[in-house]
C-alpha cells in the first residue's frame, strides 16, 4: 500500500506544475509554477515546467528544458533548447533619464520579435536579445548572449557572441536549406536515422 507521503507529494507536484493562463501578460516568473499565454505548441513539442511563455510558437518536436522564460519568439521544428533559456523579454532604452518602463511604456517599442530556425541546438543558460534571427541548423554554446543574427549551420559561443565555425560546408548548407527535411512527413523522416552520418549521400539522394 502506498504511503501518505506518496499521495501528498503527488498532490503538491500536480499543484506546483499546473499551467496558468493569465488574463494579460505577466511581468514576473515563478520558480514553482508555470505560466503560458498566447502560445502555440506544435506536434510533440514540449516545455518542461517551470516555464514562462508569452506569445511563443514552438514548432513540431521542439523542446524547452526547465526554467525557460520566453516571449515574442518563434521557434522552428526539431529544436533542442537547454535549461534557463531567456528570449524576447524586451528592451530598455539607455539614452533617456531613466531605464524604467514607468516613464516610457506605450510611448516607444519595448519588444521586437525573435526568430529561431529549425534543427537548432541551444545550450544551457543562453539569452537571446530582442530582434535577433537564428538560422536553421545552428548551434549556440552554453552561457552565450545572442546579440546579433546568426546564419544557418553556424556554431556560435560566448558573450559577446562569436561564430567559431560552421557545421557543414557552404554547398552542404545550401543543399540542406533546399531539402528542408524538417517539413517531411513521419514516414520520410525515418530515412534520417538510416543515413544519419552520411551527409553527402543524404544530399545526393534528396537534393533533387
Locate each region found by the language model.
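Domain-scale signature associated with acetyltransferase and cell-envelope carbohydrate enzymes
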Residues: 1-119, 126, 170-208
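Short coil-to-beta-strand initiation/turn motif
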Residues: 68, 85, 128, 144-146, ...
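Beta-rich strand-turn-strand
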Residues: 125-138, 144-148
Amino acid at each position: 500500500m502506498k504511503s501518505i507521503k506518496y499521495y501528498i507529494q503527488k498532490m503538491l507536484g500536480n499543484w506546483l506544475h499546473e499551467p496558468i493562463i493569465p488574463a494579460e501578460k505577466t511581468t514576473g516568473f515563478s520558480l514553482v509554477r508555470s505560466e503560458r499565454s498566447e502560445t502555440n505548441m506544435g506536434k510533440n513539442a514540449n516545455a518542461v515546467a517551470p516555464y514562462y511563455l508569452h506569445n511563443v510558437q514552438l514548432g513540431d518536436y521542439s523542446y524547452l528544458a526547465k526554467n525557460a522564460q520566453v516571449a515574442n519568439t518563434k521557434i522552428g521544428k526539431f529544436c533542442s533548447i537547454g535549461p534557463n533559456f531567456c528570449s524576447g523579454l524586451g528592451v530598455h532604452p539607455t539614452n533617456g533619464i531613466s531605464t524604467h518602463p514607468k516613464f516610457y511604456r506605450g510611448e516607444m517599442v519595448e519588444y521586437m520579435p525573435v526568430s529561431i530556425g529549425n534543427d537548432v541546438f541551444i545550450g544551457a543558460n543562453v539569452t537571446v536579445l530582442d530582434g535577433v534571427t537564428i538560422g536553421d541548423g545552428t548551434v549556440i554554446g552554453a552561457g552565450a548572449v545572442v546579440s546579433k543574427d546568426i546564419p544557418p549551420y553556424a556554431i556560435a559561443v560566448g558573450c559577446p557572441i562569436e561564430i567559431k565555425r560552421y557545421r557543414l560546408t557552404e554547398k552542404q548548407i545550401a543543399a540542406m536549406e533546399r531539402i528542408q527535411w524538417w517539413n517531411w512527413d513521419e514516414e520520410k523522416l525515418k530515412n534520417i536515422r538510416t543515413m544519419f552520418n552520411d551527409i553527402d549521400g543524404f544530399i545526393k539522394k534528396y537534393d533533387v
